A protein has these predicted regions:
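Eukaryotic scaffold repeat domains enriched in small/polar residues
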Residues: 1-361
Length: 361
């Protein structure tokens, strides 16, 4: 049989080592001594280089552009994944940032940005212009997720051990999930100890990476607890500080395991399907993995703090894999049939054929 189709394919990485986005103030004309000493740039219009420092939360807009929140640089990188061009949503230019962590994008390309340093969530329109600020109920907002169909914004509050639910248009606080005030000590199902990444599936169910409890908790769209899975450990299917969670179009649950620098993929029955990663800088390995997001085309993006990079993978869906396997099998059978035909011995003519053949003159 032909080998099965690879279900997760590495595609690219983003680091922006040579991106230049911020103008430097013009200085006096440099002398030959300045050039020799290296005290001034050779070009008055030269700009400093920027690269990802500590990328965390990510989001993808309707055009396929990738947004990456960088808490060290204090900016949001906007990568055109087709042309590899980069823009920045900058601190003190487009908005005021202290420590940006979480990102989420709605169907109108409105961007939500969590900043625990300022205890709020900012919103930007599609032109990257600031619009609104959410402060109600927030102490240390981190992970963000949007239920676009039901118009709900979920905000994981790390210090309060809660997930806050807002109406996505009016930005009104609707309810809280979890118990607060216990200093990250609660282990009961439905409560959290430093919740980090969150995600919403197609049915409106909420998934929460409960970091200190080393588990994933699942709630329905009304905030009612459904189930939990995961235990502390470093073996397959176990967690060591899960930080991020995402859902693909087949409803598989992708979990970023912080201390193990790996990604584990589960089905809805919490059965482990695949695990990949490990400590390292090679493609498909991670150093300080922090976040994960999956877009509508099943591109998977992971962020890493220590090398300052984002890696891009492609998840091949169940339907796509079935079709590709059928095509592979058909090609194999066609090749085998042609091979058998070429290798079959020549059939001698029958006596009837010999008798009816014209006699050469």
């Amino acid at each position: 049989n032909p080998p099965a189709v690879a279900r997760i394919k590495y595609q690219a990485f983003y680091a922006a080592e040579k991106i230049s986005q911020v103008d430097t103030p013009k200085t006096k004309k440099e002398s030959w001594m300045d050039r020799l000493a290296g005290t001034q740039p050779a070009d008055e219009n030269a700009k400093p280089l920027f690269q990802l420092g500590e990328p965390y939360g990510m989001a993808v807009d309707s055009k396929g552009n990738l947004y990456v929140a960088d808490q060290k640089v204090g900016a949001i990188f906007v990568f055109n994944t087709a042309t590899r061009e980069v823009e920045l949503i900058k601190n003190k230019v487009h908005g005021h940032f202290v420590r940006i962590i979480g990102l989420a994008m709605d169907d109108n390309d409105r961007l939500f940005v969590s900043d625990p340093g300022l205890r709020h969530v900012l919103t930007f329109n599609a032109k990257h212009e600031p619009e609104d600020v959410i402060t109600e109920g927030l102490v240390s907002p981190g992970g963000l997720a949007l239920d676009v169909e039901n118009r709900l914004l979920y905000v994981a509050d790390i210090d309060q051990d809660q997930v806050l639910v807002y109406e996505a248009d009016s930005l009104k606080l609707l309810r809280r999930i979890g118990t607060t005030g216990q200093n990250h000590a609660l282990t009961t199902p439905g409560d959290f100890a430093r919740p980090a990444g969150i995600a919403v599936d197609a049915d409106g169910n909420l998934y929460v990476a409960d970091t200190l409890n080393n588990r994933i908790e699942i709630f329905d769209g009304d905030g009612k607890f459904i189930r939990t899975f995961g235990k502390a450990g470093d073996g397959p299917g176990y967690f060591s500080r899960p930080k991020g969670v995402a859902i693909d179009s087949d409803d598989h649950i992708w979990v970023v395991d912080g201390m193990q620098d790996r990604v584990q993929v589960f089905n809805q029955d919490a059965q482990l399907l695949i695990s990949f990663g490990g400590h390292g800088l090679l493609p498909g390995m991670f150093q300080g993995i922090a976040g994960i997001t999956i877009d509508k085309t099943n591109r998977v993006f992971t962020s890493e703090i220590f090398p300052g990079r984002v890696q891009q993978f492609l998840y091949v869906t169940d339907a796509q894999a079935d079709q590709l396997n059928k095509e592979k099998e058909a090609a194999r059978e066609k090749k085998a049939g042609a091979s058998n035909k070429d290798s079959s011995p020549a059939v001698p003519p029958s006596p009837l054929t010999q008798a009816s053949a014209p006699t050469p003159k």
